[in-house]
Amino acid sequence: MERVKKFFESDAPVKWIFYGDSITHGALHTFGQRDYVELFSERVRFELARTMDIIITTAISGDNSRGLLNSFDWRVAQFKPDVVFLMIGMNDCNADNDIEFDEFESNLSELAAKIGDLGAVPVFQTTCPILPGQAPERFPHFDSYMDAIRKVASDRKLPLIDHAQYWKDHADSHFYWMNNAFHPNADGHRAFAQLIYRCLDIYDENSHSCRFHIP
């Protein structure tokens, strides 16, 4: 994570990309409120006065790791990013699709390599847990897919933001952070943003974008 933190010490503008599925896309389930990428943008470009930084979301609802690979050149490479935040897995762990666990892990490794080949830093993220007992096509497989994210990040010595573990550590709030079985609401996106701030050492309790009430 130190490689990412150093960007905040530089006067050079930084290009940040957030890549993933509907959870990062932030559509529908926030009901018009800011998603975690928009909150990150507020914190970085306004509150930290990094006005020349560019923050791009190229996440697409319904996507999976195979889709991220297939459209990588258009959605990531053309922008020549400095940092790529990757959050994926909720659709991969769906038993109704044809992405097996081994392919998921392989896709993660290939994504990490492709991001690294651009000279960018990949930041792996686990995603929000599924509400207990819901989404039976996903729930039994979710933990193993999150473990794959942790393993690839560890094997490649990549930064990891472990939202899944953080949410499990705050299990009493889990229900209040969700819009349905596996999509976070606006409060869930605030929880995402706050953990990112803390992991990057840019959390400030006096900041407007850091001090939102989260149930």
Regions found by a protein language model. Give the residues of each.
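Serine-esterase "nucleophile elbow" of acetyl-processing enzymes
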Residues: M1-S61, S71-K80
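Structural recognition of the beta-strand scaffold that forms the well-ordered cores
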Residues: W16-F18, I54-A59, V83-M87, P122-T126, ...
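Surface-exposed cleft-lining segments at the edges of enzyme active sites
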Residues: G26, T58-N64, M90-D102, P132-E137
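Non-membrane alpha-helical structural segments and their capping/turn regions in soluble enzymes
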Residues: R34, R66, D98-S109, F139-D147, ...
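Catalytic-core regions of hydrolytic enzymes
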Residues: I60-V83, N97-N107
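Active-site segments of SGNH/GDSL-like serine hydrolases
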Residues: M87-N91, A112-D143
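Charged, glycine-enriched surface loops/patches
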Residues: F101-Q125, A148, V152-L158
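Catalytic His-Asp segment of secreted/periplasmic serine-dependent ester chemistry enzymes
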Residues: C128-P215
